């Protein structure tokens, strides 16, 4: 089989055509993590503004704050896994 490769070459990424996409994927994880953290901060500000402006929309504000916690946790996890 001419197209078969040894799995250790893929894991260690010694070949340039395998190593470069893995580096690009690693970089994109941290970029996605930063974007998720920024979106989560935006959701926190929207939730705080909704809570301070009107008392009738507490459900919407709490949904924004819960979404921000989920997105922030995911973004922090991606950045933490990228740097470890």
Curated annotation (Swiss-Prot):
Keywords: Late protein, Membrane, Transmembrane, Transmembrane helix, Virion. One of its GO terms (cellular component) is virion membrane. Its main location: virion. Induction: Expressed in the late phase of the viral replicative cycle. It is found in: Virion membrane. The chain crosses the membrane at residues 31-51, 60-80. It comes from the Viruses. Belongs to the asfivirus EP84R family. This is Transmembrane protein EP84R. It comes from African swine fever virus (strain Badajoz 1971 Vero-adapted).
């Amino acid at each position: 089989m001419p197209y078969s490769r040894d799995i250790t070459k893929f894991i260690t990424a010694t070949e340039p055509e395998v190593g470069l996409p893995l580096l690009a994927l690693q970089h994109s994880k941290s970029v996605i993590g930063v974007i998720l953290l920024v979106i989560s901060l935006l959701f926190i500000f929207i939730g705080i503004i909704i809570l301070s402006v009107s008392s009738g929309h507490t459900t919407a504000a709490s949904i924004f704050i819960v979404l921000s916690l989920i997105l922030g946790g995911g973004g922090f996890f991606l950045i933490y896994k990228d740097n470890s």
